[in-house]
């Protein structure tokens, strides 16, 4: 799923004027897939005295936003700013994804050289004045990161701060984490203990959870029939087989997405939740996933296909600078080459 968001001319011109430091705070919102000006505040006191009274009233518990907050310090380009991504837990998933993916666009439009610090928050405590001071401390010392700072770090690492921009450059959204429901957790534990050999999971897009569909015993020949034709699914399959004389039980993860018969929302959510689900499965349930597959149809899941994916054929390495052997039987008689003397003296 690719998205392109447009920066309105009003916002672009306002950001250009604001860089000279006349304002204290700028709020940016997404409306109708456009980046628009939400609110603007002038400075009244020093940056720290203005901070909570000016910033906190703009935090909607149900809607994300970006906030550019002007500090009183300067660098070579002018006043330094704090860039805040506000994404409350109760806001809709689609909004969270849009704001997460458009972060880099807003920063680029404003001018990254003016931004001194960045923060990510889901509750007021994350980005209030005390939260910012904690953030500064954590950046200057090897102290444990807060949950919000870990989330910001993860966003940077996974490149969700993507080029969804005016240019237009595109990037997929990734990295949401829906919680596993109790039955799904129980099934994963049973798979880790080898008490079952198949799990099918689905996303509940309304409740924003990962739910168990079933754990029916499944052989390789049954596997294609487990892939729905009209909806995405996550599958974990215990692939029992022999390889080079050894009996193996390899966990294979299958993400099935049946073409474009699914809604855009489903495609976005399943794609975005996949990596975080796998991280949790490997970390919390100690399930080592031997192979991760993405398919659009169960027809692909043959025994030969699974074997080749889990054990890809290794290409023989060519010996460096090896001289080719001559044709067999055409080498002629061997010759003895002696030195300058009959007794082997040096020539």
From Swiss-Prot:
The UniProt record lists the ADF-H domain at 3-137, 175-311
Keywords from UniProt, A to Z, are:
Actin-binding, Cytoplasm, Cytoskeleton, Repeat
- Per the record's keyword annotation, is Cytoplasm included, yes or no? yes
Cross-referenced Pfam families = Cofilin_ADF
> Which sequence ranges are marked TM in the entry?
none
List the GO molecular function terms.
actin filament binding; actin monomer binding
* Name of the protein described by the UniProt record: Twinfilin-2
Lineage, top ranks? Eukaryota, Metazoa, Chordata, Craniata, Vertebrata
**Encoding gene (name):** twf2
């Amino acid at each position: 799923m690719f998205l392109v968001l447009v920066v309105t001319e009003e916002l672009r011109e306002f950001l250009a004027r604001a860089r000279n430091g006349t304002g204290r705070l700028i709020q940016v919102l997404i409306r109708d897939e456009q980046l628009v000006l939400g609110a603007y505040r002038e400075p009244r006191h020093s940056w720290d005295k203005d901070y909570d009274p000016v910033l906190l009233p703009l935090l909607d518990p149900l809607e994300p936003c970006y906030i550019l907050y002007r500090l009183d310090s300067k660098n070579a380009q002018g006043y330094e700013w704090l860039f805040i991504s506000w994404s409350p837990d109760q806001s809709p998933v689609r909004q969270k994804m849009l704001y997460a993916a458009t972060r880099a666009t807003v920063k680029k439009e404003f001018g990254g050289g003016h931004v001194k610090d960045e923060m990510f928050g889901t509750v007021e405590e994350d980005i209030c004045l005390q939260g910012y001071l904690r953030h500064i401390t954590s950046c200057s010392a090897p102290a444990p990161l807060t949950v919000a700072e870990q989330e910001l770090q993860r966003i940077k690492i996974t490149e969700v701060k993507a080029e969804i921009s005016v240019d237009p450059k595109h990037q997929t959204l990734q990295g949401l984490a829906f919680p596993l429901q109790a039955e799904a957790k129980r099934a994963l534990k049973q798979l880790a203990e080898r008490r079952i050999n198949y799990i099918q999971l689905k996303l509940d897009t309304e409740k924003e959870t990962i739910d168990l569909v079933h754990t029916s015993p499944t052989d390789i020949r049954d596997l294609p029939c487990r892939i729905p034709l009209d909806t995405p699914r996550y599958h974990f399959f215990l692939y029992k087989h022999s390889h080079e004389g050894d009996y193996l039980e390899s966990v294979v993860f299958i993400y099935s997405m049946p073409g474009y018969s699914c809604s855009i929302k489903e495609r976005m959510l399943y794609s975005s939740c996949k990596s975080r689900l796998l991280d949790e499965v490997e970390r919390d349930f100690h399930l080592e996933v031997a192979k991760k597959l993405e398919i659009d149809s169960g027809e692909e899941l043959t025994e030969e296909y699974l074997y080749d994916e889990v054990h890809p054929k290794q290409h023989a390495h060519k010996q460096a600078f090896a001289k080719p052997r001559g044709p067999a039987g055409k080498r002629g008689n061997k010759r003895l080459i002696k030195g300058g003397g009959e007794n082997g003296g040096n020539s």
